[in-house]
Amino acid sequence: MARYLGPKLKLSRREGTDLFLKSGVRAIDTKCKIDNAPGVHGARRGRLSEYGVQLREKQKVRRMYGVLEKQFRNYYKDAARIKGNTGENLLQLLEGRLDNVVYRMGFGSTRAESRQLVSHKSILVNGKVVNVPSFKVSANDVVSIREKAKLQSRIKAALEVAEQREKPTWIEVDAGKMEGTFKRLPERSDLSADINEHLIVELYSK
């Protein structure tokens, strides 16, 4: 399945919520009619079935983290094998992806841009180049910008925007050095309340 390369706003309108796919601090403007389906004359959403609600939630989270369908299913299988709450395990696995950690540290303005930084070998993990976006970051790993990439204007711009956002408590960042430490996996209370991971568990449990 190919990665979606179309308009980012269209995906947010499809899911009826801001997926934070576009750069910037502010949420998507209300004039964008996010409650309406995509299209010039996007209709108001009708009532969804139980399955439809579960599917939409899965699609929302998958698109938010920029993960393909097969990858997402594999993350769920891994989460189900880990002791504890499957839904919370799933979110922690997604949060531990290198592209997401780069985004959380503010080196990329979006997860898509962060994924590109990783793929273009601009990111170091514990001093070594890692160019796999799905690389699993562990507690106390140090993630930094490669020396020759530090002059990139987009990284500087992303860090400036990140300064205005609420900083994740599970990550420590030195913007001057362009490096950060992944202190721990986030707790469920650290993450967005707008995600209902229980619906995803119900969907895959059928």
Swiss-Prot record:
The keyword Ubl conjugation does not apply. It holds the Pfam family Ribosomal_S4. One of the primary rRNA binding proteins, it binds directly to 16S rRNA where it nucleates assembly of the body of the 30S subunit. With S5 and S12 plays an important role in translational accuracy. Residues 96-156 form the S4 RNA-binding domain. CDD domains: S4 (cd00165). NCBIfam families: PRK05327.1, rpsD_bact. GO terms for cellular component: small ribosomal subunit. It comes from Aliivibrio salmonicida (strain LFI1238). This is Small ribosomal subunit protein uS4. The gene is rpsD. Part of the 30S ribosomal subunit. Contacts protein S5. The interaction surface between S4 and S5 is involved in control of translational fidelity. Keywords: Ribonucleoprotein, Ribosomal protein, RNA-binding, rRNA-binding. PROSITE patterns: RIBOSOMAL_S4 (PS00632), S4 (PS50889).
